[in-house]
Amino acid sequence: MKPPSGSTKKSKPPARGRAGRARAPSRILLAALFAAAFALVPALAAVPRAIRLLEALAPEGPSVLGLSAPAGSFLLGACLFALAFVAVRIPAIAYVAVHETTHALFGLLSGARVTRMRVAEEAGSVDVSRPNAINLLAPYFFPLPCVAALLLFGLASLVFPMAGRPAGAVAAGICGAAWGFHVCFTLNALLQRQTDLDAYGFLFSFVLVLLLNELFLFFAYVALSPVRLVPALGILRALGADSFGWFLDGLFARI
């Protein structure tokens, strides 16, 4: 995709489109974003550590793929979709629609105007009045189908509790398949050398996308498991502080 300085935003299939017009970021902003990305690198290690610790602390119960039922079912659903993605030609228009809808959604959330959206088999476009790093990168870190599935099962669980039941494992598997959709198509799009990641500096964009994907998995794990949010956030904060401390110790040891 093309940086915000251009009049169009295009990419090769399966996601090609336009996110609007804006000035290219200044060198000062790019330098600040580079520094921010460098500072966030320790968080990339903290989030997976937190998920692993939550899984290790999971109560005894049925297991799937050697993991707790929610985590194993989620992973199984993602793997099954990945196999289907490799074995069967899934229409690219499904991802193009999700990709452009996510651009538009985050554009609206940021207060911009979305004036036009086009979705076709091999390409798509959306006009956003004030593109920025978040709405430009949103399709790469916000798995819209998985979020929709989580919200759907969350509402259903208000009527029919699913945690610890077979229905909960099925729900986790469906959410995992939806996340697999996001990962497979996003990786396929990134292999086309998307210029979206270059607009605000590749390192900043890469770190932000990876970190927000990790954070989504963290919150999805909490949502699908019996884990309470507040203790889970406490674990994440503690491991984040530990990772940053380790990072700073290593950095100053080399100075």
Task: Label each PLM-derived region with a short phrase.
Residues V88-A92, L108-T115:
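Selected alpha-helical membrane-embedding segments in polytopic membrane proteins
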